Amino acid sequence: MLYLIIYDVPATKAGNKRRTRLFDLLSGYGKWRQFSVFECFLSVKQFAKLQTAMEKLIKLDEDAVCIYVLDENTVQRTITYGTPQPEKPGSIII
């Protein structure tokens, strides 16, 4: 599944630290698309692990995180101008 994760964290000293930590966390799971937007192709297990980590990081009374779950049919119907359409990472064979 493709998870489109969009977040908004206040521009305060503490918020800036959380935003940086959230960016670093999401960078380990997916592709940074634009400011505060990540595309993450994840298994159910990976997504559960990411959710747990995000829930520990964000402040529910200050931050906003929206996660859109897109199945393969929806991803194939994505219209993209400019940069390439989201692609599922390929397998690495060693």
Swiss-Prot record:
CDD domains assigned to the protein according to its UniProt record, in alphabetical order: Cas2_I_II_III
A molecular-function term among this protein's GO annotations: RNA endonuclease activity
Keywords: Antiviral defense, Endonuclease, Hydrolase, Magnesium, Metal-binding, Nuclease, Plasmid
Cofactor section: Mg(2+)
GO biological process: defense response to virus; maintenance of CRISPR repeat elements
EC number(s) recorded for this UniProt protein: 3.1.-.-
Enzyme class: hydrolase
PANTHER family listed in its UniProt record: CRISPR-ASSOCIATED ENDORIBONUCLEASE CAS2, CRISPR-ASSOCIATED ENDORIBONUCLEASE CAS2 3
Subunit structure: Homodimer, forms a heterotetramer with a Cas1 homodimer.
Designated name of the protein: CRISPR-associated endoribonuclease Cas2 1
Gene from which this protein is expressed: cas2-1
